[in-house]
């Protein structure tokens, strides 16, 4: 079965538990930390996936590495180890965050700009694009991209709104070459 499909099932179950126990915000933050730890330490995932390392050692390693997270998330990680599914932890985190955002009416956006955006510019973009995509709140991550030249390019999910100078130039070039 596809890793993302499996991850969505685990994320859905974890999401229901989080709602029942009112741990939605806490688990979302903890999953972001877990995802970051796995991203920064690629050897951790390879050790946890290694077939010759005993399951007890893997569990001890996870308990030590993530001692400060909630027991619900620790149990989820142990379950993933038991079922040899620890490699889906990043997909699980992404799916859980998407479910949590959907429940709150929040979307995540990446804004590419030639320079760092001010807080006022970020808030203005969040207000405008939140209405366009039909959410209450838009969380913006600003990425500096000198290729943008000017303006901004906004990515929300799989939708891209390109108001950048480079995007306008590319569209103009396509029109002129037809």
Curated annotation (Swiss-Prot):
InterPro entries: ATP_synth_OSCP/delta_N_sf, ATPase_OSCP/d_CS, ATPase_OSCP/dsu. It is a peripheral membrane protein. It is found in: Cell membrane. One of its GO terms (cellular component) is plasma membrane. Keywords: ATP synthesis, Cell membrane, CF(1), Hydrogen ion transport, Ion transport, Membrane, Transport. One of its GO terms (molecular function) is proton-transporting ATP synthase activity, rotational mechanism. SUPFAM superfamilies: N-terminal domain of the delta subunit of the F1F0-ATP synthase. Pfam families: OSCP. PROSITE patterns: ATPASE_DELTA (PS00389). The keyword Ion transport applies. It comes from the Bacteria. F-type ATPases have 2 components, F(1) - the catalytic core - and F(0) - the membrane proton channel. F(1) has five subunits: alpha(3), beta(3), gamma(1), delta(1), epsilon(1). F(0) has three main subunits: a(1), b(2) and c(10-14). The alpha and beta chains form an alternating ring which encloses part of the gamma chain. F(1) is attached to F(0) by a central stalk formed by the gamma and epsilon chains, while a peripheral stalk is formed by the delta and b chains. F(1)F(0) ATP synthase produces ATP from ADP in the presence of a proton or sodium gradient. F-type ATPases consist of two structural domains, F(1) containing the extramembraneous catalytic core and F(0) containing the membrane proton channel, linked together by a central stalk and a peripheral stalk. During catalysis, ATP synthesis in the catalytic domain of F(1) is coupled via a rotary mechanism of the central stalk subunits to proton translocation. This protein is part of the stalk that links CF(0) to CF(1). It either transmits conformational changes from CF(0) to CF(1) or is implicated in proton conduction. Belongs to the ATPase delta chain family. This is ATP synthase subunit delta.
């Amino acid at each position: 079965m596809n890793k993302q499909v499996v991850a969505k099932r685990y994320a859905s179950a974890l999401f229901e538990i989080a709602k029942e126990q009112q741990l939605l915000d806490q688990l979302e933050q903890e999953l972001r930390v877990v995802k970051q730890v796995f991203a920064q330490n690629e050897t951790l995932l390879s050790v946890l996936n290694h077939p010759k390392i005993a399951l007890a050692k893997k569990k001890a390693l996870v308990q030590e590495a993530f001692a400060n997270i909630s027991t619900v998330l620790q149990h989820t990680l142990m379950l993933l180890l038991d079922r040899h599914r620890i490699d889906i932890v990043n997909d699980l985190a992404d799916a859980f965050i998407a479910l949590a955002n959907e429940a709150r009416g929040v979307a995540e956006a990446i804004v590419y700009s030639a320079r760092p955006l001010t807080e006022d510019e970020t808030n203005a973009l969040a207000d405008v694009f939140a209405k366009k995509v039909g959410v209450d709140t838009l969380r913006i991550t600003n990425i500096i991209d000198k290729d943008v030249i000017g303006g901004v390019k906004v990515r929300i999910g799989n939708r891209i709104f390109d108001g950048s100078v480079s995007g306008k130039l590319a569209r103009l070039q396509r029109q002129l070459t037809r």
